Amino acid sequence: MGRSRGFIEAIYPTVQQFFPEQLGGVSAEQFYRAVNKAQPSLVRTESDELTYCLHVMVRYEIEKQLIGGTLEAKDVPAEWAKLYKEYLGIDVPNDRDGCLQDSHWSSGAFGYFPSYALGNAYGAQMLHNMEQDVDVEDSIAKGELAPITAWLHEKVHQYGGLYVPADVVRNACGTFDPHYYTDYLTRKFSELYGL
């Protein structure tokens, strides 16, 4: 929702007030397009909505190989560079901006990255289901977020500590289906880029 056209249009006048020099000649449409620009990047946390999961996939592939014993730690930088080129078309200039950019592995947090991709897919399915009960675009345009937060509280937040994520999603919006996420990305970026 935070990168949606409706949300950008609703908050943009306030954003312009805080940054009058930088955004004085920039329309809400231009700002929306800039916020949603799809372009491969070197750093996961600076990536766009469309390519983010490719960053996650690189990490997942490397974790699988490490845990499966088919990749040694000393070979991670080369594998990272290979996968970044293959998945994102990017050359990795150094290990700091490559395989050392995240703190997860150095703290022993393996298997964590896929949860980011799942969160995006869960979010798309929840948004789809929320739109059946709440006029999301209208609520955002009017700055009335109470119907959205009420839906989230009723269907998701109050159960977050009681059930595992898959059960929270199933209870809120049925069996998990990643097509909601791929459909969301296809619709959004087809419209943005006239595809």
Specify the residue positions occupied by each region the protein language model found.
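A conserved active-site cap/scaffold subdomain adjacent to cofactor or substrate pockets
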Residues: M1-L71
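C-terminal, non-catalytic "cap/extension" segments appended to globular domains
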Residues: V56, Y60-L195
